[in-house]
A protein has these predicted regions:
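Residue-identity detector for glycine
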Residues: 20, 47, 109-113
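Glycine-rich, aromatic-bearing surface loops/beta-hairpins
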Residues: 107-152
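Extracellular/virion structural assembly segments
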Residues: 1-12, 17-19, 26-35, 39-92, ...
Length: 152
C-alpha cells in the first residue's frame, strides 16, 4: 500500500463497484466494454488528502489516459466526499469513472473455443513511465511511498 495508514490497517479500505454498464455492438467479434463507477472508501482516515489523490492521478495517467484527454470527462471522472468524524479524521469516499475493453479471439485447436483478452490501454505519448520507487512529501512529512513492478 502506498499510504502508510492503510499498510498498518488495511481494513480501513473498502473498494466496490457502485454502478456499471456493459456496452457492446453487433459486430463480427464478441467485444465489449465495461463502464463503471469504482468507489473507494477510506474509513477513519487521518492522513493528508494528497497521499490518496496523487496515487490515483498516477494510476489514471497510466491506465485511463483517455479520461485525461477528454475535456468533458476529465473534470468529472474523479469525485470525492469527506465526512468529518473528528478534528483529525474523516471517512473519505472517492468515485472514479472507469472503462475496460474486452476482446475475444478464436482459441487455436479448440473448436468453438475463444480466448478472452482484457486489453491494456495504449501508452499515451505524453505519459512518461514512473520510476519503480517513488515517495510523496509535504514539507518534511512523508505522505506516501510505493515500490511497484512497472511491467504491464
Amino acid at each position: 500500500a502506498a499510504i502508510p495508514q492503510l499498510k498498518t490497517d488495511p481494513s480501513k479500505l473498502s473498494i466496490l463497484i457502485k454502478s456499471g454498464v456493459l456496452s457492446t455492438r453487433l459486430t463480427t467479434s464478441l467485444a465489449f466494454e465495461y463502464n463503471y463507477t469504482l468507489q473507494v472508501l477510506l474509513l477513519d482516515y487521518s492522513g493528508h488528502p494528497d497521499a490518496v489523490m496523487l496515487p490515483i492521478v498516477m494510476w489514471r495517467r497510466q491506465h485511463q489516459p483517455d479520461l485525461l484527454d477528454n475535456p468533458d470527462r476529465q473534470t468529472k471522472a474523479v469525485r470525492f466526499e469527506a465526512d468529518f468524524l473528528t478534528a483529525t479524521t474523516v471517512d473519505l469516499a472517492i468515485e472514479l469513472d472507469l472503462t475496460e475493453n474486452v476482446f475475444t479471439r478464436p482459441r487455436p485447436g479448440v473448436g468453438g473455443g475463444m480466448d478472452v483478452i482484457h486489453k491494456a490501454e495504449p501508452v499515451h505519448p505524453s505519459v512518461q513511465p514512473f520510476s519503480e520507487e517513488w515517495s510523496l512529501w509535504f514539507r518534511d512529512e512523508l505522505l506516501a511511498q510505493w515500490n511497484h513492478d512497472p511491467r504491464p
